[in-house]
Each structure stands twice: as structure tokens, then as C-alpha cells.
């Protein structure tokens, strides 16, 4: 229905490529089903999302028995809006609101702070770990 009602144009693209980082970089907003791409787009590119109202079966996951909701489901309403059959006709207004309302920018900032530990230190920490591991392994080899 969305693709039919909103055909591709110079301003709108329905991209289904496997390598999607270039289109994500160019986009102002993402309308998506439930997927990890939502967080790539929103947290890496600092842009809002509209996500589909989907049922999530957590029974295959290790934490299926937890009574608290997964972080993902508490973060989604802070970074964008849920698209349902009831509000589908308001999609244009939802897009405008997600782009313009500062609460979504604030929500993205909060989500980044909650997920990115040691921001800017990833390479340094990985190299330090690998060097430490190498040193440990070479010491064991030398002792034999």
C-alpha cells in the first residue's frame, strides 16, 4: 500500500538493495519494518524513523522469560513513531513531525548514550586487547 500510494520520485526512493548505507546517508527519514537497519539509520546518521507495528516473538531468544521489555522496544518510541493501519493515512504528517519535533533528536541522543560505551576508543581498545592476547599466547608458547 505504501509503495502504491507513494511512488518513487526525485524525492522518494524505495530501496531494497543489500548495500544500503549510501541511500541511508542521503535519506532524511526511514520508514521500515522491524529491522536492525532502524538503529543503523537512526543512531549512526542521527535521523528519525517510522517503524511498522509488528508482532515480535521473543520465544527463540535467551531472555524470553524476562518480565521487562527489551531495550529495543523502549528505544523505538523515543527515536521515531510507530506506523499502524490506524495512522497510515497520516503518514505525511508523521514524517513532518518526526523530522521537526526535537523530542526525537533528544531520544536519538539518549539511545546513543545508552548503547555506545567508550565512544571513539573502539580501535584503540581492540588493538590493546589483541596485543595483550598476543603477548599472553607467545609467553605460553615460549614456556613450553
Description of each model-found segment:
Residues 1-39, 44:
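Donor nucleotide-activated moiety binding/catalytic core segment of transferases
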Residues 119-144:
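C-terminal alpha-helical cap of glycosyltransferases
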Residues 26-29, 97, 132:
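Residues within well-ordered alpha-helical secondary structure of globular protein domains
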Residues 3-7, 36-115:
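Catalytic binding pocket for nucleotide-activated donors in carbohydrate/polymer assembly enzymes
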Amino acid at each position: 500500500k505504501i509503495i502504491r500510494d507513494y511512488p518513487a520520485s526525485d524525492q522518494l526512493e524505495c530501496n531494497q538493495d543489500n548495500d544500503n548505507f549510501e541511500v541511508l546517508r542521503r535519506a532524511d527519514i526511514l520508514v521500515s519494518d522491524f529491522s536492525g537497519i532502524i538503529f543503523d539509520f537512526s543512531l549512526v546518521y542521527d535521523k528519525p524513523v517510522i517503524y511498522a507495528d509488528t508482532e515480535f516473538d521473543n520465544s527463540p531468544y535467551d531472555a524470553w522469560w524476562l518480565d521487562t521489555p527489551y531495550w529495543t522496544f523502549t528505544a523505538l518510541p523515543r527515536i521515531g513513531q510507530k506506523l499502524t493501519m490506524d495512522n497510515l493515512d497520516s503518514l505525511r504528517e508523521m514524517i513532518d513531525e518526526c523530522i521537526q519535533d526535537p523530542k526525537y533528536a533528544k531520544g536519538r541522543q539518549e539511545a546513543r548514550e545508552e548503547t555506545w560505551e567508550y565512544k571513539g576508543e573502539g580501535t584503540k581498545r581492540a588493538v590493546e586487547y589483541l596485543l595483550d592476547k598476543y603477548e599472553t599466547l607467545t609467553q605460553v608458547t615460549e614456556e613450553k
